[in-house]
Amino acid sequence: MQYSFTEKKRIRKSFAKRSIVHQVPFLLATQLESFSTFLQADVPTAQRKSEGLQAAFTSVFPIVSHNGFARLEFVSYALSSPAFNIKECQQRGLTYCSALRAKVRLVLLDKESPSKSVVKEVKEQEVYMGEIPLMTPTGSFVINGTERVIVSQLHRSPGVFFEHDKGKTHSSGKLLFSARIIPYRGSWLDFEFDPKDVLYFRVDRRRKMPVTILLKAIGLTPEQILANFFVFDNFTLMDEGAQMEFVPERLRGEVARFDITDREGKVIVQKDKRINAKHIRDLEAAKTKYISVPEDYLLGRVLAKNVVDGDTGEVIANANDEITEGVLEKLREAKIKEIQTLYTNDLDQGPYISSTLRVDETVDKTAARIAIYRMMRPGEPPTEEAVEALFNRLFYSEDAYDLSKVGRMKFNRRVGRDEITGPMTLQDDDILATIKILVELRNGKGEVDDIDHLGNRRVRCVGELAENQFRAGLVRVERAVKERLGQAESENLMPHDLINSKPISSAIREFFGSSQLSQFMDQTNPLSEITHKRRVSALGPGGLTRERAGFEVRDVHPTHYGRVCPIETPEGPNIGLINSLALYAHLNEYGFLETPYRKVVDSKVTDQIDYLSAIEEGRYMIAQANAAIGDDGALVDELVSSREAGETMMVTPDRIQYMDVAPSQIVSVAASLIPFLEHDDANRALMGSNMQRQAVPCLRPEKPVVGTGIERTVAVDSGTTVQALRGGVVDYVDAGRIVIRVNDDEAVAGEVGVDIYNLIKYTRSNQNTNINQRPIVKMGDKVSRGDVLADGASTDLGELALGQNMLIAFMPWNGYNFEDSILISERVVADDRYTSIHIEELNVVARDTKLGPEEITRDISNLAEVQLGRLDESGIVYIGAEVEAGDVLVGKVTPKGETQLTPEEKLLRAIFGEKASDVKDTSLRVPSGMSGTVIDVQVFTREGIQRDKRAQQIIDDELKRYRLDLNDQLRIVEGDAFQRLARMLVGKVANGGPKKLAKGTKIDQAYLEDLDHYHWFDIRLADDEAAVQLEAIKNSIEEKRHQFDLAFEEKRKKLTQGDELPPGVLKMVKVYLAVKRRLQPGDKMAGRHGNKGVVSKIVPVEDMPYMADGRPADVVLNPLGVPSRMNVGQVLEVHLGWAAKGLGWRIGEMLARQTKIEELRVFLTKIYNESGRAEDLESFSDDEILELAKNLREGVPFATPVFDGATEEEMSKMLDLAFPDDIAEQLDMNPSKNQVRLYDGRTGEPFERRVTVGYMHYLKLHHLVDDKMHARSTGPYSLVTQQPLGGKAQFGGQRFGEMEVWALEAYGASYVLQEMLTVKSDDVTGRTKVYENLVKGDHVIDAGMPESFNVLVKEIRSLGIDIDLDRN
């Protein structure tokens, strides 16, 4: 087994029973693949597929002018490279995007030519089409300087759907069937039955019309309509009665209304008897072809065709007419023998279309189309052209109607056609096929569709959503271009004069900036980032709304298995509408979710992996991943638990066709991080998944001792760690950068064989948490591609580490863990275990105002020198300054209007030229309740404005850093070149050279070392070929130097040019404050099993319960929090964590004793290879074993994968290994070694019973008391009511509401009540008077009229009721 450089340092012992057949796919693949198919940036123009931008362009172009003599054709498009990189865009508040340019061709035709196809002129040109935001390598977008994510949308797939109302519409509870054809874009077409069994249709949910109007509009006559939906009974009229053609199936189950006889007149079925299978057999045996029927049998039947008199051509009866005695008489008079009637019965052949035809009053195609026009455009006169145009545009025009590839595939599958491709508009036979299936459903044949089935819901990803917006923009452009194309020739216009890119830019900007699906990225920790990108929402444009979504849509569906996680979804109004992709889920070409399965052939499990969609999966019998498999791959058990069409059952192995890939296949990333998930109640697991996303990164991340083995995948895929792009040797490392000399076999010729990784240091995330990367490699380390070089926030040696491992005791402690409160030891705070750094960004802008420009300066009047002490000469705070609330960070003055001056001021001005009163101080100060250290300052200056010293210094520092990178690259490139050169020169014969090298001398190493490297090029070699090589190496080094100088120049130009700032802004300063948050009472904490609580008290170490060896517990939790919540996983985690730490202590003790390496190896083998997945420790060298052991001293990390975790036996084995009997006895453990005798820290007495003690990975969540604590004395008031504002953000007060008033009334505290409702709230004059009185030292209250009463009076007056106050 191959271990990466970082994995070797600390191997996680896995208890998995199953080998890994299929690696977890790259977790951000959906986003990245979708967007790259949208752009197709790296695909050569000729090879671009018709999807994404290409599809949008080809669907709108060519654009033809109204007169047809000019057209604009699309040739190709290209994307330029972005002007700024991602980091620069974030700093400057720009969008990381690329300019889109399309090459278009304007073709003008010759108006004079008779054929209208002679090309007169062709103009080709590249036209700017707006900016397209680019995706970062981690799947997000930088829009206006902030990272955003486009969430995928789960919507109803285009196609045709059949459903019924479940009997809710009509009081009788009758099922009313309906069908709906949903295109990708265009009008919806609905068909529905009413309670009288008449079939109607509607377009776009407008008023309903009989469906036969639509059938007539597509060109069918009533005869053709009936022929499409009914089978006919054939009758031959006789002088008395008639002969009916005998069709056995149609008679079965009917009651004979007359004696049925055979040809000889023998009675086979007597009158009023029900016809059964025996009667049918008898009639068939008698070879009956016709049955004689009396005349009244014909009455009430419906004619299938128009009956025409052969002689006169007169229509005697129309199709769909009922046969009455009068009609029969006419038929006999016209000597008509043969007639056809519709065959209907009450059971499975209803007369629905026939009764619909009776309701329909239109006569022909034109009338039908006019009726549809009137329904769509009421009140407009139906002219012939308008009627035709509207009808054709509804379903037949490619511009207005698009079923899409998916829609056509779904449609054809549903109506039972074999081919899955076809036209993208609706065809006549599509409408017919839909109505036929709907009528069959009403007749009791077939099944309705389940709209929550994942085969009927598809995912729209970023690429598709962006394409739709882009197309919308292009369509707006198309309208404008059509108008102008007519003038193209006369005004000699070029393509760029015709196309205005504004509509495209605004459509794209609106989508990425403010669409419901474009969300501010949740960046609290790597997991929240990755989950946000894997989220699937049913909300958004074209989706559901919270209010309308019922229970069924939100519920877990059998087809979610392996596609959508049944656990991870928000609590609250969005439950079930926002989901997360399962671990292995993947999208197919149509946008349906697929999940991988292993193929099973003849009861043997193969390694072939097939991805199945929800529809395909229904056809197979699929075994669960935990089915027992023998060594030969055969299924061992007699009965295997499996699923077929959503039902779970036990079947014999020979019926199994597929098997799950992994037990964790059904859950999402967050849920798969919960160890012992199988022992937790789903509601609590849901909370656990959601709360892991809120874990704040700690100052020193610590890997979970009990994990699930997927931590490394999450950390690496999230992009928070730094991975080696190419293998090589670490050449240089410091806290901020890593330089790697690339292996020769991986270096590409002509490229620099150096990789430089600049680490992210103390950067603010979207949620104000701190992103900081720390190198984990040393100089000289050999790394290969994909190895982790540096840890990011919340990662430890390349593994996700959201919290800390705490020593937990489950016991009550003086009521401080009542109702889930958490008791914590002071040592946890002292060791900074849960200390986190939060970074706040504070901005100030200097604008150009009407009265003059604002100025950023240190020179502010009325401020004491103490307050300006932290500012430099430019008026900007120093980096490293520690600031409190109210301190000045950036000095700024704003000009204010001229005021009337007193004579004294005029005099002062005249003498001293004093201007100070003209400006007011608008400096940036630290907001209330905040304090911290300034860690970074950025200054942006508009072009054409002089930079201050501070701004210049920042630029110089940045250039210095960049030059350092280039120098490192050059040093390594030159070093490599000179090494190659030395190897080439040694032993060669020289014709002369520096330091009087004689002709014919052989060059040796000592001579070369004595020379300066650059003088090597002056050696004249005897060998011409070698001389050429020498020259080539010299040229390549000079070329590289030149390249580096150019790169430096470009960087300098970019930094020294003015910044793009919003209009009217001259200068912008951003100050970053690092705030250290220690754990304190009121902070919310949680485990991974939904066991959340609030810190109630931080107890001195000496008062905490402790063990016999003096070790105190870190956290005390309430044991009552476990049974009712049914999340027993936390107890198992504590037991396994106890074993993990115990093993770590034993290894630490062995290292302290300086045990032989061999003994260590044996002990480690015992831990890793006695149960669960074996690790290959044989391949480790002694040094590697030693390093591994050193890293395991803090606990052997365990992995217990979900649904495939550690068993009770394995856990007790590990506990026995960790705590031999002598240690167990010393700690007074119970026999199973998971409970320990604890002593009360305050009295030293042992507690009565042993206590469950162990290690749990515990998280500090983002709900910190510091962000919520708030107090106000005076502050802002609401404009209308004059009551204090509410909320911390507004520096508001606490609302004293109706119920609180009742409480004071109950106490009879009338004076308190009076001041609450007047001077402390909205009595404006009263509150100023109180202040005045307090200043005078006179403590009385004069309560006046509350402002809200005046508002009430005005409100009543506005209703026309005069109301006045009688004042006493």
Swiss-Prot record:
**Keywords, alphabetical:** DNA-directed RNA polymerase, Nucleotidyltransferase, Transcription, Transferase
**Catalysis: reaction(s):** RNA(n) + a ribonucleoside 5'-triphosphate = RNA(n+1) + diphosphate
- An example Gene Ontology CC term for this record: DNA-directed RNA polymerase complex
Per the UniProt record, which EC number(s) apply here? 2.7.7.6
Q: Which GO terms describe its molecular function?
A: DNA binding; DNA-directed RNA polymerase activity; ribonucleoside binding
Query: Subunit composition?
Result: The RNAP catalytic core consists of 2 alpha, 1 beta, 1 beta' and 1 omega subunit. When a sigma factor is associated with the core the holoenzyme is formed, which can initiate transcription.
Q: Which family does the entry's similarity section mention?
A: Belongs to the RNA polymerase beta chain family.
Described purpose of this protein according to its UniProt entry: DNA-dependent RNA polymerase catalyzes the transcription of DNA into RNA using the four ribonucleoside triphosphates as substrates.
Q: What is this protein called?
A: DNA-directed RNA polymerase subunit beta
The taxonomy runs: Bacteria, Pseudomonadati, Pseudomonadota, Betaproteobacteria, Burkholderiales
